[in-house]
């Protein structure tokens, strides 16, 4: 089935999604399964970057992910600690994999790393004990550190470091129009959160504890320019606060959290945030 045919079938099924159930067979199930398989292999992705830097969201692929929850029934998923099991609709990406399959895939998955089927992991990536949700795309030589979450359909570029405990938001709940996008060579500091379709542009650095949503103000300390929904290329961002409006009694009001661009990436920053190739051999 061609991509155009897949898109047409999936869009039609999504419009009539109330009729799609675990009993649905035929063209709709085949189209959704095929789309998820393509996502799993990295042959298609939920969002794609054009030469001019603009990202296009393939909404039909996001719809395929959503439809899979209506098509698939709950089942036992083995592999829990102490021979325990899980109960879910989405199998592990690694179900049935052997040594040869992992060698061909070319990435590292440390015990405790959970990746759901339809997420793509590129060569030389490293997955510490973490969670990568369905439809996500993790590109080459990226490190997903311990206790990180990569949300549904999130797009992570090459040579990205997502530090311990950081969260990259998904698109499924609450439903978002576009996924979070982390472009190449970015550094996401420990315990930071990027959600609601925010785009972190190439080479940007978020320090520890930066929280970014679609409405978070990102203030350039040098120019006063305010960004929302997008971190500029090579920006170094730290947590900050904006002064609040005075209260009715004239006293200072509570401040509002923001993010602050303190500088652009320089050699000193690169030396602190560069990836270690030894970990990716």
UniProtKB/Swiss-Prot annotation:
The keyword Transferase applies. It is found in: Cytoplasm. One of its GO terms (cellular component) is cytoplasm. Pathway: Amino-acid biosynthesis; L-lysine biosynthesis via DAP pathway; LL-2,6-diaminopimelate from (S)-tetrahydrodipicolinate (succinylase route): step 1/3. GO terms for biological process: diaminopimelate biosynthetic process; lysine biosynthetic process via diaminopimelate. Keywords: Acyltransferase, Amino-acid biosynthesis, Cytoplasm, Diaminopimelate biosynthesis, Lysine biosynthesis, Repeat, Transferase. The keyword Amino-acid biosynthesis applies. GO terms for molecular function: 2,3,4,5-tetrahydropyridine-2,6-dicarboxylate N-succinyltransferase activity; nucleotidyltransferase activity. HAMAP family: DapD. Homotrimer. PANTHER family: 2,3,4,5-TETRAHYDROPYRIDINE-2,6-DICARBOXYLATE N-SUCCINYLTRANSFERASE, MOLYBDENUM COFACTOR GUANYLYLTRANSFERASE. Belongs to the transferase hexapeptide repeat family. NCBIfam families: dapD, PRK11830.1. This is 2,3,4,5-tetrahydropyridine-2,6-dicarboxylate N-succinyltransferase. It comes from Nitrobacter hamburgensis (strain DSM 10229 / NCIMB 13809 / X14). The gene is dapD.
């Amino acid at each position: 089935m061609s991509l155009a045919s897949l898109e047409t079938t999936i869009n039609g099924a999504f419009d009539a999604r109330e009729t799609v159930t675990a009993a649905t067979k035929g063209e709709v199930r085949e189209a959704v399964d095929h789309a998820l398989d393509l996502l799993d292999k990295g042959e298609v992705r939920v969002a794609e970057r054009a030469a001019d830097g603009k990202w296009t969201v393939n909404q039909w692929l996001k719809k395929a992910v959503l439809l899979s929850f209506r098509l698939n029934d709950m089942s036992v998923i083995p592999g829990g600690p102490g021979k325990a099991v899980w109960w879910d609709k989405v199998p592990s990406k690694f179900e049935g994999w052997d040594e040869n399959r992992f060698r061909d895939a070319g990435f590292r998955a440390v015990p405790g790393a959970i990746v759901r089927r339809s997420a793509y992991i590129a060569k030389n990536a490293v997955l510490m004990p973490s969670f990568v949700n369905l439809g996500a795309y993790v590109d080459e030589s990226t490190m997903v550190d311990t206790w990180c979450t990569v949300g549904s359909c999130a797009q992570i570029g090459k040579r990205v470091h997502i530090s311990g405990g950081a969260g990259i938001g998904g698109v499924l709940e609450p439903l978002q129009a576009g996924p979070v996008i982390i472009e190449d060579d970015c550094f996401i500091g420990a315990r930071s959160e990027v959600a609601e379709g925010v785009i972190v542009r190439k080479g940007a650095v978020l320090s520890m504890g930066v929280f970014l949503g679609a409405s978070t103000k990102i203030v350039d300390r040098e120019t006063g320019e305010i960004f929302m929904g997008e971190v500029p290329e090579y920006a170094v961002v730290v947590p900050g606060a904006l002064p609040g409006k005075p209260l009715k009694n004239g006293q200072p009001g509570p401040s509002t959290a923001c993010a602050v661009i303190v500088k652009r990436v320089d050699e000193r920053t690169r030396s602190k945030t560069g990836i270690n190739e030894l970990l990716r051999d």
